[in-house]
From Swiss-Prot:
Listed name of the protein: Flagellar basal body rod protein FlgB
Lineage: Bacteria, Pseudomonadati, Pseudomonadota, Gammaproteobacteria, Enterobacterales
Any GO CC annotation of this UniProt entry: bacterial-type flagellum basal body, rod
Organism: Buchnera aphidicola subsp. Baizongia pistaciae (strain Bp)
Keywords of the record: Bacterial flagellum
Protein purpose: Structural component of flagellum, the bacterial motility apparatus. Part of the rod structure of flagellar basal body.
Amino acid sequence: MLDKINNDFNINKILLNLHAYRQEILASNIANANTPGHKSSDINFSKTFGKLFSNALQGKKNNLTTTSNKHISNNDNVELSNYDEQTVKNNSYVSKNNAINIDVDRINFVHNGLKYNADVVFINNKFKNIMNVLKG
């Protein structure tokens, strides 16, 4: 029974991790807005999510390399840097020092944060529903 509950939350774990990863990239863009030569980057969210989700469905895990059976692997952790889909965006406005459109990156940062928060609320509601069912 716990396996079914765990599998049900797997997609949510993937989504939250991917939103958090994208948030780091967007924050880096904003922080480096005045850094000469810095290029704006982002991930192809749907492509990366598709890869992670299909790997999860196929049971593929992103394990650490272990040289002994006594070593601990990270088979439950999603290593997003393995799916580094960073691409340089083509911005219509580029400052003289770098290729960052700060307004677009700020909007994407807020939008991604809202999606992350919505996913957290959804997960909390799932937990509440499960607890209500278990209580009877």
